[in-house]
Amino acid sequence: MRIEISSDNPLEHATPALVVGCFEDERGRVFEECDAALGGCLGRLAETREFTGKAGTTRLLHTLGKLPAERLLLVGLGKKADLTHERLRQAAGHAMQALRTSRAASFASTLPLASSLPRATESVAIGSLLGSYSFDLYKTKDKEQRFAFEEMTLMAPQPEREMARAVAEQAEQICRGVQLARDLVSHPGNVVTPGYLAQAARELAARHALEVRVYEQDELESLGMNALLGVGKGAAEPPRLIVLRYRGEGAKGRPVVLVGKGITFDSGGISIKPGPGMEEMKTDMAGAAAVFGTLEAAALLRLPVDLIGVVPTTENMPDGKAFKPGDVLASLSGTTIEITNTDAEGRLILCDALHFAQKFKPAAMIDLATLTGACVVALGHEASAVLGNDQRLVDALKKSGDETGERLWQLPLWDEYGEGMKSDIADIKNAGSRDGGTIKAAWFLKQFVGETRWAHLDIAGTAWSEKARPYSPKGATGVGVRLLIEYLRRK
């Protein structure tokens, strides 16, 4: 979808649809002027409470030639004092849903004019772009009749036009990263394999002149990455370790390292999962997808940062060669791990990757993983969990999460949680009792980060949505990309 910026009077702008934001407690200039042009019908809707301006509501009207805009789409913003960037993004997303239903491929939006928030244009652009997303690559019927958005015109005052254009371009670049992450998670597991991710990394590197290295199985064996190799023993395709590096112009200091869990399909292995819902286990590489998407967006934005992405990737499958409960694996760090549950495999591939990443001497290391079902039990689908060994890093990520709507909730990481991870025959075991499962998984990872400033994001409940949300359709959300870009921009 193309983005244009216009300083036209909204009432004089010809468009298939004009989006107008409406507050519950204030009508606003554009609303009043449109109401006058339409003979008071908008005011009548408000008086009869057929449209109240409540957040999340929309109302589409045909102007019947009384305005250059063919249709008027009213979008509720709630009470003016409660307006936030997230509410603007959601309003833009609700508008996209209504426009899709009415098949308005091109439209103009006055939503940026409804707010004095400093980044209103960016919020509206992001909500609109992400709300326009659909994934229908594998559908073969009625291709010629499928709807696709073509052009969005954002209205901005003349003095702010060029700034709005630059902000909209940045929003588009961020959304390209989110869309890459969504696409990778949406593909089926027979397409996205470890080899596919390796090729996607090479293509990403080629697009933006990034450094890339893919460690193949023989190299992993030479390095001693036996935790990663152990998980991949039951898979037909060998595991890989993918390393990408973006060196932004003007970057100073040590790099930031992102580590993303890349289990391209998780059957649970010998500790096999129940059949119902197993098809969603193609999403167990959402952490890897977020790392790829963040690198894409950072490169497009030309952020002045040194950013490294590390992605351990494999499938977790049952097989005669698969690792088993009771096995002991010697990790890259030398720590020995008793396997008590082969379905606790994500932490195994991550522990080798985290130890490996220390060689870059990072200023901060952040891992993202669909790691535990316990996180979904604790937080549902409205927030990701964050845990770490550095409170300043955790606080910075939480602030970025609040700003972008990708909210984080901090869980404790006290040493007592490690008591249940002690093994009788090895240094530690990979899974303890079910209680506090998210914390225990993070405690396990903490054993492999050394003194590096580190934070862990458990995105198990937020990487995939079983329902459509205002600016995210049912399916992959691309969570983590916008949060991390905001964190990097603030550095």
UniProtKB/Swiss-Prot annotation:
Mn(2+) 2 binds at K261, D266, D284, E345. The keyword Nucleotide-binding does not apply. The keyword NAD does not apply. One of its GO terms (molecular function) is manganese ion binding. Its cofactor is Mn(2+). It comes from the Bacteria. GO terms for biological process: proteolysis. The active site is at K273, R347. Binds 2 manganese ions per subunit. GO terms for cellular component: cytoplasm. Its EC number is 3.4.11.1, 3.4.11.10. It is found in: Cytoplasm. It catalyses: Release of an N-terminal amino acid, Xaa-|-Yaa-, in which Xaa is preferably Leu, but may be other amino acids including Pro although not Arg or Lys, and Yaa may be Pro. Amino acid amides and methyl esters are also readily hydrolyzed, but rates on arylamides are exceedingly low; Release of an N-terminal amino acid, preferentially leucine, but not glutamic or aspartic acids. Presumably involved in the processing and regular turnover of intracellular proteins. Catalyzes the removal of unsubstituted N-terminal amino acids from various peptides. This is Probable cytosol aminopeptidase. It comes from Geobacter sp. (strain M21).
